Amino acid sequence: MCIRDSTYRCLANDVLVEKKIPVNPIWQEFFEYHTSQDYFKTVIKLFEKYMPNYKWLEQQTARIRNTQGDTKVVTDTQFVVHQPYHTTTRTTHIDNPIEFYAGLLYFRQRGDRSSGGDFMIYDSPEIKDVYKKKGREIPENISIKDHTSVPYKENTFVMFLNSNKAVHGVTPRVDASVDRLSVNIIGEYTDRSACTFRLRPID
């Protein structure tokens, strides 16, 4: 279990290996598949024409993050709970370069009458500098434009390939009184030398 500020994360290792979090068989199967070699290969195939190193990735054997094993890639699936805040907990940013894909599956709760909490995708130039202490938030002088808004809605899924143009964020929730629920599905490198882009941290 990982807790940061107002966000709680339950990792695949907690569910599948350490058995710290009891889940019903449906969720057990969900976590097993979305951290599996089959799913990893499916995602690589989906994005292959956008990945300069996809042939190398196809040859890798994935393991669950935070487990033992000699591999260059890891996968994770996470329950994520964001407590209700009137400001966004995720401004425009780029994910860690060690991540090469990410998916988000939303589970808006019945009775959630808030607005906002939508996933925003932006058009942007290639980003080189980020505020590392602010979660790789991009500088204010970078010109970005709204591209796509994915509503915070039950059973809504969005997936993206991480790059130095994959700028995204979450709109503020208004009148939020219940938690914002989602599942993250992630693929990462274990060695930063494999990353396809770099970000310079700025204060």
Over which residues does each language-model region extend?
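Catalytic core of non-heme Fe(II) oxygenases with the double-stranded beta-helix
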Residues: F40, N53-R200
